[in-house]
């Protein structure tokens, strides 16, 4: 079956379409016009209602109509309704009976009788007065509460209190007598005016004064402790938890511009912290009650939020573990930060107050009459007062040190006795300790010391005067060490030239010292003191002037070329002393014969010889480890004595090789002589003339066997 045909639609012409569109546009225009007119009517009605309500609020509150023009009031109106119109006013002359915030702000045109204006002014004044009374009452109650809870600052003893004791004891008769002991100082400048618009308080706000966050006392910068935000919050939190502060008082204190605290509240803050958390040390924080920790955390976050909002910072919620660590840091840093000398309270200077006090009265006024009361001081305070007035301070007076503190403990007894015997009342003869007063520090046995005798070469002028010499301790010390058996070269270089103890080429310490062959004595030549051997006729060995040992090239040569006492062979005393004097004469350039010069260096080579030929029928003992000296050691000691020390590579080669003379590839005597020939040709000549062992020439690589080449593939380096 076929579906029925759809009905035919009416055909609309183009003219009809245009007419329909025109009607629709006209209808839309009318709707928009009606809507805009209704909105305008609604806004006008809203503005009228706002004005009526605002005037009603002003009249009921007793405030002038000028409050409608305040910016804060207009912002409040826009907050509730953004499309609300601002109250329009007209400029007029300011009324003297109406209080205005600014004279340039336009005033609202209102119709108000004089009675209403006076009433509004009276209500405004009463409101301000009541607010001031409430604030002053609150400040008074807070200060009274502080006086009962917080300990007062430690009172500084004033000038009147300090000087009254001196007056009562009869130290000074009049004020002019005290005035002469103090310098005049200008009077301190007057404090600046208070800041405009500041709230009334018990202290005066100045640009250089800062109130304490606990006692509200005006403080100078040098009288207070600067605190960070976190430190101030912790202090105020402890005050709230311990019951000394209310939360409102702590919030008011945290809003201060500069957070400072008195020096005297440091111990009190620690007591508050201990009372708040029931802990006295950092280790006890982990054991404190949980409720204390949670309560302190809440108060800390609340005060921190108030301080951040007041300073325009982004508020932060401190977690519990950070708060706990901050409390631990306070206990950890309490002693070093609050008790050390860097934060100690500076002592005030009483000069300004004293000068002003004494200038206001005549000079003949009695001190008791000036002060009008008497006070008592202890003996220590009395002495301190007398020192202050007289300008004497004996804290830094230098005291003479004892001789036992300066010298070594080993030789203090002998040197002290020598110093006492050579004082002003003692005879002029030099003192040499006897056998009962000296002990050998190494071998611990007594020796027999020779008493000094006058020398024939002008030793009659021997004198020891303490007035001419400041401290003769150095001379006595040096003489005592030498008499103990130490070498003069070692002592002079050790004490005066800062040269370490003399060692041989291998760095070995010499054996136990033995006493010298002849004792030493002091002599004075041309106003200078000298140390020399008693039986010697040559120049002195050590030159001493005042407290300084004169060290010259000739003196150095004399000290270094003199043979060591412990290295001397077992010969007679006369031969050893003569060899020593020969070395002294040679070093000081004394005129000698050529034969004596030729015998100088071979004498040095005979220190502890292994083979000694003598005509006396003495049995030769076999060499031991203690008395055997290798040729390398002998040559190294001789070169070290003459030129200071060997080079590093030469010393290493000597240490590594058992026999220096049998190793020509490392360092032979001829090569050493060639190196030092320019420095001391005379010594090189003597060393060259000395007998030496025959050289051992090793085979070349061509003569070596294959096994020897494998064992020693590389030749040894030369130096």
Curated annotation (Swiss-Prot):
Annotated GO biological process: cell differentiation; negative regulation of vulval development; positive regulation of gene expression; protein stabilization; regulation of cell fate specification; sex differentiation; vulval development
Keyword rRNA-binding applies: no
Example of a GO cellular component annotation carried by this entry: nucleus
Disulfide bridges in this chain: none
Disruption phenotype: Greatly reduced nuclear accumulation of lin-56 protein and increased mRNA levels. No obvious vulval development defects. Double knockout with the synthetic multivulva class B protein lin-15B, dpl-1, efl-1 or lin-35 results in a multiple vulva (Muv) phenotype.
Top-level division of the source organism's lineage: Eukaryota
Region entry Disordered, spans: 179-199, 419-464, 559-626, 684-719
Role, per record: Synthetic multivulva (synMuv) class A protein. SynMuv proteins are required to repress the induction of vulval development. Acts redundantly with SynMuv class B protein lin-15B, and lin-35 to negatively regulate vulval development, most likely through antagonization of the Ras-signaling pathway. May also negatively regulate vulval development in association with other SynMuv class B proteins such as dpl-1 and efl-1. Regulates let-23 basal activity. Required for the correct expression and/or stability of lin-56.
Official protein name in the record: Protein lin-15A
């Amino acid at each position: 079956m076929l579906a029925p045909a759809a009905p035919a639609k009416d055909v609309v012409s183009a003219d009809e379409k245009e007419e329909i569109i025109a009607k629709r546009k006209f209808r839309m225009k009318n709707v928009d016009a009606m809507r805009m007119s209704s909105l305008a009517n609604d806004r006008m009605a809203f503005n009228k209602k706002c004005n009526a309500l605002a005037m009603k609020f002003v009249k009921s509150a007793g405030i002038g109509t000028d409050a409608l023009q305040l910016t804060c009031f207009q912002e409040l109106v826009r907050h509730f309704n953004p499309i609300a119109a601002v109250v329009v006013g007209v400029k007029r002359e300011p009324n003297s009976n109406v209080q205005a915030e600014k004279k340039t702000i336009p005033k609202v045109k209102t119709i108000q009788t004089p009675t209403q204006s006076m009433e509004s002014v009276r209500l405004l004044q009463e409101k301000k007065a009541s607010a001031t009374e409430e604030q002053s009452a609150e400040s008074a109650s807070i200060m009274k509460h502080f006086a009962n809870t917080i300990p007062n600052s430690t009172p500084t003893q004033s000038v009147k209190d300090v000087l009254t004791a001196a007056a009562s004891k009869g130290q000074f008769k009049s004020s002019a007598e005290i005035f002469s002991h103090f310098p005049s100082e200008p009077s301190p400048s007057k404090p600046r005016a208070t800041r405009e618009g500041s709230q009334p308080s018990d202290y005066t706000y100045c640009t250089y004064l800062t109130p304490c966050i606990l006692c509200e006392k005006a403080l100078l910068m040098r009288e207070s402790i600067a605190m960070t935000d976190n430190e101030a919050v912790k202090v105020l939190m402890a005050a709230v938890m311990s019951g000394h502060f209310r939360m409102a008082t702590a919030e008011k204190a945290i809003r201060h511009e500069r957070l400072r605290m008195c020096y005297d509240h440091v111990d009190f803050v620690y007591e508050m912290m201990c009372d708040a958390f029931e802990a006295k040390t950092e280790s006890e924080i982990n054991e404190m009650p949980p409720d204390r920790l949670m309560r302190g955390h809440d108060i800390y976050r609340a005060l921190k939020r108030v301080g951040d909002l007041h300073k325009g910072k982004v508020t932060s919620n401190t977690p519990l573990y950070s708060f706990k660590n901050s409390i631990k840091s306070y206990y950890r840093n309490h002693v070093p930060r609050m008790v050390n000398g860097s934060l100690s309270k500076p002592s005030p200077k009483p000069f300004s107050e004293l000068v002003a006090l004494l200038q206001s009265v005549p000079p003949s006024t009695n001190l008791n009459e000036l002060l009008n009361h008497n006070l008592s001081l202890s003996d220590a305070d009395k002495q301190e007062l007398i020192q202050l007035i007289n300008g004497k301070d004996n804290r830094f007076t230098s005291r003479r040190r004892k001789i036992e503190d300066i010298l070594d403990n080993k030789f203090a007894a002998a040197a002290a006795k020598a110093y006492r015997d050579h004082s002003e009342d003692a005879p002029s003869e030099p003192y040499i300790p006897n056998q009962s007063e000296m002990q050998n520090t190494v071998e611990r046995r007594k020796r027999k010391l020779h008493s000094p005798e006058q020398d024939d070469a002008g030793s009659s002028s021997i004198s020891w005067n303490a007035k001419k010499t400041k401290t003769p301790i150095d001379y006595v010390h040096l003489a005592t060490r030498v008499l103990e058996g130490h070498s003069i070269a070692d002592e002079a270089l050790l004490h005066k030239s800062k040269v370490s103890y003399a060692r041989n080429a291998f760095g070995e310490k010499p054996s136990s010292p033995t006493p010298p062959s002849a004792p030493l004595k002091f002599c004075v030549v041309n106003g200078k003191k000298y140390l020399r051997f008693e039986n010697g006729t040559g120049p002195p060995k050590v030159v001493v002037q005042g407290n300084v040992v004169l060290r010259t090239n000739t003196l150095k040569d004399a000290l270094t070329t003199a043979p060591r006492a412990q290295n001397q062979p077992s010969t007679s005393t006369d031969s050893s002393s003569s060899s020593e004097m020969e070395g002294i004469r040679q070093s000081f350039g004394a005129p000698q014969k050529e034969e004596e010069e030729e015998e100088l260096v071979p004498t040095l080579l005979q220190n502890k010889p292994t083979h000694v030929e003598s005509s006396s029928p003495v049995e030769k003992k076999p060499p031991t480890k203690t008395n055997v000296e290798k040729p390398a050691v002998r040559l190294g000691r001789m070169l070290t004595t003459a030129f200071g020390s060997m080079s590093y590579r030469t010393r290493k080669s000597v240490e590594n090789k058992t026999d220096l003379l049998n190793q020509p590839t490392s360092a032979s005597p001829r090569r050493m002589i060639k190196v030092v020939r320019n420095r001391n040709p005379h010594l090189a000549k003597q060393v060259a003339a000395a007998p030496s062992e025959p050289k051992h020439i090793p085979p070349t690589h061509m003569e070596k066997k294959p096994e020897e080449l494998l064992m020693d593939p590389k030749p040894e380096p030369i130096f």
